[in-house]
Structures are given as structure tokens and as C-alpha cells.
Swiss-Prot record:
Membrane protein topology class: Multi-pass membrane protein
Domain of life: Bacteria
Alphabetized UniProt keyword annotations: Cell inner membrane, Cell membrane, Membrane, Transmembrane, Transmembrane helix, Transport
Single Gene Ontology MF annotation: xenobiotic transmembrane transporter activity
Organism: Salmonella heidelberg (strain SL476)
Protein encoded by which gene: mdtB
UniProt name for this protein: Multidrug resistance protein MdtB
Subcellular locations according to the entry: Cell inner membrane
Entry-linked InterPro entries: AcrB_DN_DC_subdom (IPR027463), Acrflvin-R (IPR001036), Multidrug-R_MdtB (IPR022831)
Residues annotated as transmembrane: 25-45, 347-367, 369-389, 396-416, 440-460, 472-492, 537-557, 863-883, 888-908, 910-930, 968-988, 998-1018
Length: 1040
């Protein structure tokens, strides 16, 4: 595209100035498209950047962590490891549960990943234990992603088993069908079952064994095909009373005969209706409850999903008895909506402040209306493009539009100011519009494309950070582009019809006072600039010192990854001694819950104890603390966490780890604290040697707090050491021993009761109430070759040992995850460096590897690419400016203003006590685009004066600085006030917005002062350099 030079009559704006109706209709079309687009845009907390993640859960009640690892997890991992597109595979194998989490590359569609996972499970089926109660179940959900909604179902009249049955069949299934729902889990799921508790003494007295009982039950309760009779006239279906449905029927079941008399199950066992797993429990505000956690699919629209669930709830609750109460304990969308509302308010406030600044400078209602129309038009038109690109209304896109407020008004200000200058000189409005727009058209194009060039590197950022800021960068670029179009079309057309000498000269007392103030400021600036031009080397020294100071501040400033948000929900892990039982954990959680609910900021609490897909070991409990709305509590979430941990610290035998939930979830497992670091080895023995050493070293670091690990190798285990020779002589196999132990202590699911709506289990176990602990093993009896029974103690010796409570793998190798927080006064960058230094000090062997995980790993990657990102932005700007100016020298002059922005931004962050995180870095990159606009406006007019008026470079730059001082000040203040609401934000999600505002306001304040003086000096320096090069190399005809 050939750009018309300054001074032409109208340039690209001529057609639009002369055709006001067409221009008006074109702008109306943009406005209408934007309004329609806004109605179709979904609302979210952040852009969708989730990794495709699938969780595979396999439950095998009674199996030890060793058995789960070797028999279940390892076969699955071998198949999963062959899948293409797999980024990371982690697993947890604990008592009775195996959880494998598969994280795929961002580019792999979730549906494709799902198909590969299903195929891998099918391939591993033959390698899994034949008596698994259920096959592996996969869910399209990230287990570390907090639930979008938590519901508690309670009843003061019904047992939890009946409540759970109704919730599972009437509520959970329906919610699972909602589009966007990835998984509905029932914490504390007390599924109904018939529990058979054998009396070991009674069984032994009759010469029976638990295996005899199990065989009798499984043979008496079947549900299989029986065929049909097909006669000449009628067909008859065969059925029988082969199913037993109630505990009473099982109680009357004959399991053997003694001396001709029947022995019924009720004679040797307590048979009752109970729960399938008696070691699971959940509480809502200390009341027993079934807690429903609803998690979304990766990439699903969280707002739409939550709205669909809420619309469905009234109908679902009507199907439940009156005594059953369903309560929404938490809804993440409440805070998301509040955060978006606050950001929308800050956007409107930014628009109002920008318009106010325009009026302050122009002091003219018609001249203020013109940019007052251009700004919302540019922003609203952006919504149409956002819909086309499948974007959403989220915190980042709204932040982009808020920042764009200061950007988009710049173009209108530059056009209006230039046209007004000619009208004030006596030219007709139409002629002034043609001349002023033509003169400034090239400047607008330069400003626009050089600013968009700054955003280009953001589009090429890799991994999740790049995905996160793609919507931000594109939204801002589109708003700037539409603004340029509006400023070259609608703005000059409105100036030609709304501005006049009378309106511009019409002044009141306030206008005259402002004019005198601006005249004095410009005069003072002119005197200061003359002195600076007379002492160029001093000014250059200041510019060089600014560059050095920028580098120094960059090195020393604390660095972080992503601001910690206050979303009103706290996730917690309660840790107890490794040998803790379910009963002791239930008691501990009651004590902890009582302390937590006493805090004035807490609204509700859910706790869960037991082993399932979310909680790996019995000595840990999961908590979710829901806080009151931000405006209803005095403290932020970190203060509440500190207070809760202090309150619980006096309870003996527990450690409470708390962290606020975040909108951005990168981890694949629920951790105790915010940051993770892994230690991986080829064997468990190697891990057991190095874990204590590394943990002790990390705990001694002042840069880390709350250091813990998931390494638990001190769980109590009873080792049954069988004398194989003695067992063989008696005709007892190891399978017989395993079956006897499993029957007694594994809550073994031995049979299934089928109904029209659901299936229920028959659970076999020993009644250990009279013989607790290891003494229960002495009651185990086995059938010998001659049909008699033999006590287990006759062929085995019982030893008490320590064993792992869980075995964790990362990409099929044993791993331990260290969790830590960063104490006040230190940054994540400090903690990462301290860990790396500690690793070097310990001199780990080659077969031991370490790696950061989750947000810490993303922080490392982002930190390594940040400098290159800024360099890429500068290079992109240089290329664009070089093309526009057809010069190698002038772009360097423009870019020389950038260090001043860096100094201001970094100083502001340090003074405000903020870290240099990803949000602040984006602010610095945007500053690069804003600050150079000052230089562009100066240099454009200086070059035009040299070319058209024959002025010397010094006179030309001096005149350009004075002429462009007012629009430079206006545009800078507009950008500053566009960012000011973000800096001062205090509502929901303010932690996310504030670093961007602080960086931009600080950078603009410092750069505005310095660039007004350094740019003309550097311009003259490079002009002399250009003349020197031409004199030394006269054959080179390139224009510098």
C-alpha cells in the first residue's frame, strides 16, 4: 500500500470527509456488528488455555500400594506411554486406589486423546487382576482444577446410604449430562450395600472358613440368562428367584450343614444394610453429607455450564424427599462474574477519565464529542472480531480493552488537534480537515503499525503462557486497528462538520485559565528544551544512565509467575501421622472444622476423609473452605489462611496446608501448597535415600516455607511370612492365604445385587470389634488337604514393618513431589534459585533427576523467554518503523526512548511491593508501544519541516517538540488514565489487574518527563552521525 506523504490534500481520509453519509453508515455498521457480537460472547475468568487432561481411576478395595502399583498402575502405564501427543503421565498408587493422570499436548484435541486412552485401557484389560470390582474409569477432567460448583446433600431423617443412592440415581447422573461437565464426584459416597461381618470364632467352631462362606454367597446370588421355551403356539420366558435383594434374605441363607442341621449365614455373621465402604466420610459444616463436586471438561465454558446446572437444580430437588436438602456451598462463577463486572466498571471509568482529559485540553464540547464517539466505537467494534475468533469476555480481554481506551483515543486526539490548529489559523473547517488529516495520516499509520508490531511477539509465545495472552494481544491489536480506521474516516469527517472558528474560540473563564496554564507550561518546556539542546552530552549521559538503571532494576526486582488471586475459595489438606486410622482422622477433622468455622470470614466448609480418586491415603483429609464475598469480609484470602493455620496449629497430631484456588490451573494433581518440585529415581530405594536429605536441605532455606513431600514410607504394615513348605504339606496354596486375608480384612465385594435402577454390592469382612489390631490375624483359619481347618499361625509368622502408604510415578518412574510456599519478603524467583543452588550443593547422582512442576515450571519457561520476548518486540518495531520511514537511523532514535519506560515501570513495581510477573511484563511490553509514540510525533513533524520548509535539524526538532507538546501530553495522560483504574482496583480479581496498571502508570510518568528532552538530543546526534557517514562514504546514496 502506497502511503501518501504529509501535506497532501486529505490523503486516505479525503473520500470519507467528502462523503459523510457513507462514512456514517459504515461506522453504524461497525457499531451494530459489535453490539450483536457482544451478545454472543461467552463470559469466563481467563481465556481457555487448559491442557487436554484425562484422569483414569481404578479401585481395588483391600489391595496394598505395592499390589496396586504392580498389578494395576504399571500395566496401564505401559499402554498409556505408547500414546502419541502425551506430554506428561503421573500416577498415585495407594491402598485400594490407582489414579493415573494423563496430560496431552495443547495441540491435541481432547476427543482424540479420549479415543487413545480408551484404546490403551482395552489393551491393558487382560493384564489387570481378574477380580477387579470395576474396570478402570476415565474422566475428561484435570484433578487439580477446583470444582466449578460444590453441592451438599444432607438429611436429618434418612441414613446417608439412602441419601447417596437417591443422589447418584436422580441428581448426579443428570448433572453429568450437562454440556461442559467433565466429572461429578460424590465425596463421602456411602453407597448402599449388604455387609456380612463374619464372627471368626463361630465360623471356626463349626469347622468352616471364610472361603466356604464366600463361595456359598456367590453361588446363591446370581443373575444370568436362563433361556425361553418356544412351543407351537406360545413362547415362555424363563426366570427364577436367583437374586437375593435384602439383608434379611442373606441372613436366612444356608451356607452349610452340620450333623444334618442347616447352618444359616445369620448364625455365623452379622448381616446388615450398610455402606459399601465404611472408611469414607464427608461433612458439610460438620454435618454428615454427600458432597457433590462438579468439575468441568478442559476447555468448557464455565459460566454456561454453571448456569445450566442451576437451571436444572430446582427440578432435580423436587424429585427428592422433603427431608433431603440440597445446598450450593460454592460456585466459582460467582467470583468470576464479580471480577468481570469490576473490570467492566474500570473500563467505563477509564473511558470517562479519558474523555475528561480531552475536554480539559480542548475545552470545547464539539471537539470533546468527536473522540467521545471514536473511543466506544473502536471498543464496541472489537467485539465483532472477538466473536469471529471464538474469544470470550474475560479478565484479560477486558483489561486489553481498558488499556486500549488510552491507545485508541490517541489517534483521535492527534487528528483533532492538528485540524483544530488550522481552523484556529483561519481556514475553513472542510479545508482544515482535508489538510490536517492528510498531514497527519502518515503519523497515524506509523503509530498504529508500530504499536501492533509490539504485540506480535506475544502471539508467538509458546506453551500455556502464549495461549493465555493470545486473546489479550489480538483484542488490543484489533481495537487499535479499528481506532486507526475511525481516526482516518469518522474523526476528520466530524471535525469538518462540527468544528468552527467560533466554537474553538468560544471560551469561558475556566477555558482561559487552562489556556494560560498550558501556555506557561509550553513556554517553560521550550526554555528547558533550549538548555538541554545546548548541553547534549549531559542529556545523553542521563539517557545512558537510564539504560543502566533499567538493567540493574531488572536484575534485582523480585520475579513471580502469575498473581495470586482471591477467589473466595481455599483448598486444604489435613495431614496426620502415617499410621492414622479412619476413625482417628474423622475425629481430627471434627476438631479442625470446629476451629475453621469459628473464623468470621468463613461462610461454609466441606471435609472429606477416606481413600478415593481425589484423596490418596487414609492419613490425609481434603478440605474446601468457602469464604464470604469480598465486600462482606475485612481480610484478603492470604490473611485468612494465616489466621486459620494459627488457629489449627494447637491441635496435636495434625498439619494443615491451605492455598487459595486460582483461575489458572497448570498442575495435574492437588498439591498441599502453591509450588512443586519433583525428585525422581529409577528405584524406590534410591528415593528413600535422597528424599530426607533434600527435604531437610529445603526446609532450612529461608526462601521457602511450609516445605513438605508426598513421600510416606512409615505406614504400619503386617507382613505375613508364610512357610511355603509347611503350607504345601497341608495342601494350602498362597492363593488360599490371600483369599482368606482378603475375605477378612479387605471389605471384599463378593457379589452384586441387581435392581432396575442400580446395582449394589455384597461386602464380606470379619467382625473385628472383639479382636482389634494384629490379634485379628490369629482368627484366620484355612482349609487343609484333608478338609480340616488350620489356623494361619500354624504356617505363617506375622511381622510388623513399615511400608509406603502410596507409590507415585512420573512418566513410569518413581517420584516424590516436594510442595512449598514462598514466605513474605521473597519471590518465586528467589525460591527457584535457592532450590537450584541446593541441588548443586547436594551433588545428586546421575540417576536422580529433579524438575519443577506446574506453575513453577511455567515460571521457569516464561522467565527464560521474557528477555527474548522484549527483544523481539523491539526488533519487530524497528523493522516496521524502518519500512515506514525508509531509514535505518530514525527508528533507532524512536526506540531510544524505551529504557525510560522500563525504569519507571520497574521502580513503580518495587515501590508498590509487586513482583515482576507475567502481567507486569505485558505492561512493560505495552509501554514500549506507547512511549515511542512521543518520539514518532516529534520526528514526523521535524522531518516534514526539514523537507518542506528547509529548516535546520535543530530548528526543526525544536519547533516539532513545541508544536507536538500538547498532543503528546494529551495522549500520555489518556493512556495513563486508561491504566489508572487497573492500578487502583480493589474488587474481585484486583490482584490480576493491578500489576498491569502499576507498570504502565509508573512507566508513563517517568518516560513522559525524560523523553521530551532525550528524544530531540538523540535525534540531532543521529543526524550528525548520518552526515558524517555520508561525508566519509560519498558513494553511498542511501538516505539515512
Amino acid at each position: 500500500m502506497q502511503v501518501l506523504p504529509p501535506g497532501s490534500t486529505g490523503g486516505p481520509s479525503r473520500l470519507f470527509i467528502l462523503r459523510p453519509v457513507a462514512t456514517t453508515l459504515l461506522m453504524a455498521a461497525i457499531l451494530l456488528a459489535g453490539i450483536i457480537g457482544y451478545r454472543f460472547l461467552p463470559v469466563a475468568a481467563l481465556p481457555e488455555v487448559d491442557y487436554p487432561t484425562i484422569q483414569v481411576v481404578t479401585l481395588y478395595p483391600g489391595a496394598s500400594p505395592d499390589v496396586m502399583t504392580s498389578a494395576v498402575t504399571a500395566p496401564l502405564e505401559r499402554q498409556f506411554g505408547q500414546m502419541s501427543g502425551l506430554k506428561q503421565m503421573s500416577s498415585q498408587s495407594s491402598g485400594g486406589a490407582s489414579v493415573v493422570t494423563l496430560q496431552f499436548q495443547l495441540t491435541l484435541p481432547l476427543d482424540v486423546a479420549e479415543q487413545e486412552v480408551q484404546a490403551a485401557i482395552n489393551a491393558a484389560t487382560n493384564l489387570l487382576p481378574s477380580d477387579l470390582p470395576n474396570p478402570p474409569i476415565y474422566s475428561k477432567v484435570n484433578p487439580a482444577d477446583p470444582p466449578i460448583m460444590t453441592l451438599a446433600v444432607t438429611s436429618n431423617a434418612m441414613p446417608m446410604t439412602q441419601v447417596e443412592d437417591m443422589v447418584e440415581t436422580r441428581v448426579a447422573q443428570k448433572i453429568s449430562q450437562v454440556s461442559g461437565v467433565g466429572l461429578v464426584t460424590l465425596a463421602g459416597g456411602q453407597r448402599p450395600a449388604v455387609r456380612v461381618k463374619l464372627n471368626a470364632q463361630a465360623v471356626a467352631a463349626l469347622g468352616l472358613t471364610s472361603e466356604t462362606v464366600r463361595t456359598a454367597i456367590t453361588g446363591a446370588n446370581v443373575n444370568s440368562a436362563k433361556g425361553s421355551l418356544d412351543g407351537p403356539e406360545r413362547a415362555v420366558t424363563l426366570s427364577a428367584n436367583d437374586q437375593m435383594q435384602s439383608a434379611d434374605e442373606y441372613r436366612r441363607l444356608i451356607i452349610a450343614y452340620q450333623n444334618g442341621a442347616p447352618v444359616r449365614l445369620g448364625d455365623v455373621a452379622t448381616v446388615e444394610q450398610g455402606a459399601e465402604n465404611s472408611w469414607l466420610g464427608a461433612w458439610a459444616n460438620q454435618a454428615p453429607a454427600i458432597v457433590m463436586n462438579v468439575q468441568r471438561q478442559p476447555g468448557a465454558n464455565i459460566i454456561a455450564t454453571a448456569d445450566s446446572i442451576r437451571q436444572m437444580l430446582p427440578q432435580l430437588t423436587e424429585s427428592l424427599p422433603k427431608s433431603v436438602k440440597v445446598t450450593v456451598l460454592s460456585d466459582r462463577t460467582t467470583n468470576i462474574r464479580a471480577s468481570v463486572r469490576d473490570t467492566q466498571f474500570e473500563l467505563m471509568l477509564a473511558i470517562a477519565l479519558v474523555v475528561m482529559i480531552i475536554y480539559l485540553f480542548l475545552r470545547n464540547i464539539p471537539a470533546t464529542i468527536i473522540p467521545g464517539v471514536a473511543v466506544p466505537l473502536s471498543l464496541i467494534g472489537t467485539f465483532a472480531v472477538m466473536v469471529f475468533l471464538d474469544f470470550s469476555i474475560n479478565n484479560l480481554t477486558l483489561m486489553a480493552l481498558t488499556i486500549a481506551t488510552g491507545f485508541v483515543v490517541d489517534d483521535a486526539i492527534v487528528v483533532i488537534e492538528n485540524i483544530s490548529r488550522y481552523i484556529e489559523k483561519g481556514e475553513k473547517p472542510l479545508a482544515a480537515a482535508l489538510k490536517g488529516a492528510g498531514e497527519i495520516g502518515f503519523t497515524i499509520i506509523s503509530l498504529t503499525f508500530s504499536l501492533i508490531a509490539v504485540l506480535i511477539p506475544l502471539l508467538f509465545m509458546g506453551d500455556i503462557v502464549g495461549r493465555l495472552f493470545r486473546e489479550f494481544a489480538v483484542t488490543l491489536a484489533v481495537a487499535i486497528l479499528i481506532s486507526a480506521v475511525v481516526s482516518l474516516t469518522l474523526t476528520p469527517m466530524m471535525c469538518a462538520r462540527m468544528l468552527s472558528q467560533q466554537s474553538l474560540r468560544k471560551q469561558n473563564r475556566f477555558s482561559r485559565a487552562c489556556e494560560r496554564m498550558f501556555d506557561r507550561v509550553i513556554a517553560s518546556y521550550g526554555r528547558g528544551l533550549a538548555k538541554v539542546l545546548n548541553h547534549p552530552w549531559l542529556t545523553l549521559s542521563v539517557a545512558f544512565a537510564t539504560l543502566l538503571l533499567s538493567v540493574m532494576l531488572w536484575i534485582v526486582i523480585p520475579k513471580g509467575f502469575f498473581p495470586v488471586q482471591d477467589n473466595g475459595i481455599i483448598q486444604g489438606t489435613l495431614q496426620a501421622p502415617q499410621s492414622s486410622s479412619y476413625a482417628s482422622m474423622a475425629q481430627r477433622q471434627r476438631q479442625v472444622a470446629e476451629r475453621i468455622l469459628q473464623d468470621p470470614a468463613v461462610q461454609s466448609l466441606t471435609t472429606f476423609v477416606g481413600v478415593d480418586g481425589a484423596n490418596p491415603t487414609l492419613n490425609s483429609a481434603r478440605l474446601q473452605i468457602n469464604l464470604k464475598p469480598l465486600d462482606a469480609r475485612d481480610d484478603r484470602v492470604q490473611q485468612v489462611i494465616s489466621r486459620l493455620q494459627t488457629a489449627v496449629a494447637t491441635i496435636p497430631g495434625v498439619a494443615l496446608y491451605l492455598q487459595p484456588t486460582q483461575d489458572l490451573t497448570i498442575d495435574t494433581q492437588v498439591s498441599r501448597t502453591q509450588y512443586q518440585f519433583t525428585l525422581q529415581a529409577t528405584t524406590l530405594d534410591a528415593l528413600s535415600h535422597w528424599v530426607p536429605k533434600l527435604q531437610n536441605a529445603l526446609q532450612s532455606l529461608p526462601q521457602l516455607s511450609e516445605v513438605s513431600s508426598d513421600w510416606q514410607d512409615r505406614g504400619l504394615a503386617a507382613w505375613v511370612n508364610v512357610d511355603r513348605d509347611s503350607a504345601s504339606r497341608l495342601g494350602i496354596s498362597m492363593a488360599d492365604v490371600d483369599n482368606a486375608l482378603y475375605n477378612a480384612f479387605g471389605q471384599r465385594l463378593i457379589s452384586t445385587i441387581y435392581t432396575q435402577a442400580n446395582q449394589y454390592r455384597v461386602v464380606l469382612e470379619h467382625n473385628t470389634a472383639s479382636t482389634p489390631g494384629l490379634a485379628a490375624l490369629e482368627t484366620i483359619r484355612l482349609t487343609s488337604r484333608d478338609g480340616g481347618t488350620v489356623p494361619l499361625s500354624a504356617i505363617a509368622r506375622i511381622e510388623q514393618r513399615f511400608a509406603p502408604l502410596s507409590i507415585n510415578h512420573l512418566d513410569q518412574f518413581p517420584v516424590t513431589t516436594f510442595s512449598f510456599n514462598v514466605p513474605e519478603g521473597y519471590s518465586l524467583g528467589d525460591a527457584v534459585q535457592a532450590i537450584l543452588d541446593t541441588e548443586k550443593t547436594l551433588a545428586l547422582p546421575a540417576d536422580i533427576t529433579t524438575q519443577f512442576q506446574g506453575s513453577t515450571l511455567a515460571f521457569q519457561a516464561a522467565l527464560g523467554s521474557t528477555v527474548w520476548l522484549i527483544v523481539a518486540a523491539v526488533v519487530a518495531m524497528y523493522i516496521v518503523l524502518g519500512v515506514l520511514y525508509e531509514s535505518f537511523i530514525h527508528p533507532i532514535t524512536i526506540l531510544s526512548t524505551l529504557p525510560t519506560a522500563g525504569v519507571g515501570a520497574l521502580l513503580a513495581l518495587i515501590i508498590a511491593g509487586s513482583e515482576l510477573d507475567i502481567i507486569a511484563i505485558i505492561g512493560i511490553i505495552l509501554l514500549i508501544g506507547i512511549v515511542k509514540k512521543n518520539a514518532i510525533m516529534m520526528i514526523d513533524f521535524a522531518l516534514a519541516a526539514e523537507r518542506e520548509q528547509g529548516m535546520s535539524p535543530r530548528d526543526a526538532i525544536f519547533q516539532a517538540c513545541l508544536l507536538r507538546f500538547r498532543p503528546i501530553l494529551m495522549t500520555t495522560l489518556a493512556a495513563l488514565l486508561g491504566a489508572l483504574p487497573l492500578m487502583l482496583s480493589t474488587g474481585v480479581g484486583a490482584e490480576l489487574r493491578r500489576p498491569l496498571g502499576i507498570a504502565m502508570v509508573g512507566g508513563l510518568l517517568v518516560s513522559q518527563v525524560l523523553t521530551l528532552f532525550t528524544t530531540p538530543v538523540i535525534y540531532l546526534l543521529f543526524d550528525r552521525l548520518s552526515l558524517y557517514v555520508k561525508s566519509r562514504f560519498p558513494r553511498h546514496k542511501e538516505e539515512a
